Amino acid sequence: MTAHASIATPGGISLATGRDVRLASRSGALTGSTAGFAPGFVQANLAILPAKLAFDFLRFCQRNPKPCPVIGVSEPGDPTLSSIGLDLDIRTDVPGYCVYKDGVLVDEPADLKAYWREDLVTFAIGCSLSFEEALMAADIPLRHVEKGVKVPMFRTNIACVPAGPFAGPMVVSMRPMTPANAIRAVQITSRFPSVHGAPIHIGLPEAIGIKDLSKPDYGDAVEILEGEIPVFWACGVTPQSVISAAKIEYALAHGPGMMLCTDLKNSALATG
Amino acid sequence: MTAHASIATPGGISLATGRDVRLASRSGALTGSTAGFAPGFVQANLAILPAKLAFDFLRFCQRNPKPCPVIGVSEPGDPTLSSIGLDLDIRTDVPGYCVYKDGVLVDEPADLKAYWREDLVTFAIGCSLSFEEALMAADIPLRHVEKGVKVPMFRTNIACVPAGPFAGPMVVSMRPMTPANAIRAVQITSRFPSVHGAPIHIGLPEAIGIKDLSKPDYGDAVEILEGEIPVFWACGVTPQSVISAAKIEYALAHGPGMMLCTDLKNSALATG
């Protein structure tokens, strides 16, 4: 992933580890996407919600583990999350954030200092960057990475199992592959249930309500070549989509592509 | 597992499926252990807690997935759990229950009709019977099954990651195996992260605070033969032990060995 070689960072700053990226985000040195940085370290989606909704949301995640694989949950009001990052401060350690009120995006601040509340709970949710690293290590090409664009994502007709106010369709990401690579990708990603796990669908987009693969709902379209089939994974955009649809009075999230870089290693997530 | 062939059930009653066992429990026809019944179906540990503690407990489980693999969570006050069992009624569908007040066992009723409250949340937690079935299918002998006794369980010096009032040591189960079978057992149980997953320790009991394998804290001792090593899995007794230690004002659970039999198939839990 070389798409972000152009991101301006002060000369000599290291972005080799999750903590490096967090500190660079905290200092303001890193303001864009985290893709390609902290190789080997788990990057996570963020959902930050009032404590009164925390059990509903965690129950939603338990019921929908493929789109919503939880890798860390904070204590209510506590901006640290030491189980996944040394001296992590969730208010500053991501390059940028989104602030939602009643489901509407109202601000995209560089930090959450003005938006933090004593009743907030942070959920860190696994992200496909972890399994993409394992796929690339197995020499499975990923077209969106090769082209330097965002992975194409689609809303499906697969309903998530609801919990409290949280409900809605599963969002999936799509990667075109040769059949042989698709089979190998099933094997590899099955070892990573805490970062979306095995594909949820393969080969027949219309069967999950996707009419046109050239028109993704999020991200960028990629070409499907002769002899390739589309492979679909549950996507971490699902919880964001569900939180927005629920018109939660107050919710915070990471900015697009600006993930929380943790101290966990992708390799440590493999179950077998 | 033939240990329960002697359990008295009315002539002709089938205990072949999870629902069969639930209905037999509901009617009072089945009053003992569920081991050996509903082969192929997931059996679960139960923890039933007041809603005000539900987020703390679910967060505890998220932080300790090996001893506390959650397979279902109810809506507050709702005695059904349709995601894991058709027309399941948690108040009646287990052969027997335990009632704890302030951490003390105060009753062992046959049903929860007199103990149900509108603020209770049910947690169904995976159980080693699921992975034991996979081990036996691979011709790996399990001594406690051969001997018709309970698996030996030990408190360790491994601290669970706390959440709210829930804290305490991990409890493990032990199965002696030849080294070749131990390796195969790691492979097989790694595929089942939602029912405790891979072993948490192998070979050196003193390293996890176990002084004497002949004196389990729960269950029955089993012999370790020449050429065998002890293999340890995180155990679903851990959440019970933690709930009891937290002296929760009101908590319900299944009776020993009397599990909630679900409609889920063990084979469906495999991640790869």
UniProtKB/Swiss-Prot annotation, chains A, B:
The keyword Lyase applies. GO terms for molecular function: lyase activity. Keywords: Lyase. It holds the Pfam family D-Glu_cyclase. It comes from Azorhizobium caulinodans (strain ATCC 43989 / DSM 5975 / JCM 20966 / LMG 6465 / NBRC 14845 / NCIMB 13405 / ORS 571). The lineage of its organism: Bacteria, Pseudomonadati, Pseudomonadota, Alphaproteobacteria, Hyphomicrobiales. Its EC number is 4.2.1.-. This is Putative hydro-lyase AZC_4080. It is an enzyme of class 4 (lyase). Belongs to the D-glutamate cyclase family.
